[in-house]
Amino acid sequence: MLLCSEQLQRALLTMNNPINFKEKFSKFADHWSPKVIAEMNDYQFKLVKIKGEFITHNHEDTDEVFIVIEGSMKIQFEDRVIELKSGEMVVVKKGEKHRPYAENECKIMLIEPAGVVNTGGAGGDLTAPDNDWI
């Protein structure tokens, strides 16, 4: 992946410098729109505010990590539903259909390869830009 000079500058600024999640979360209000805060070895760390239901989707080529920073959320799989609370995480295996949702606003971090689209191959109205830095 080729970074433009602005993206490269942002990525370099995050290296060896603390990143404050609370400060980053204060920079946006929209739900289901991941914001990149750092990169490491072609992986991106993304903060997302979620509320309500997302679409069922999968990511054919990569696993996806959900880490709950604040609040709680659930993820529905084909055969079960799991709940994640603040301080918990799960790795969703590549290709596995899942639908995240949260009754109340929940703040999470996603860790996934750069370029991963939030809706996988499903597309739709909730598809967000895949490289939106804050």
Write out the residue ranges for each language-model feature.
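Conserved short histidine dyad/triad with adjacent acidic residue
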Residues: 44-60
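A short, N-terminal "cap"/entry segment at the start of jelly-roll beta-barrel domains
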Residues: 8-46, 123-134
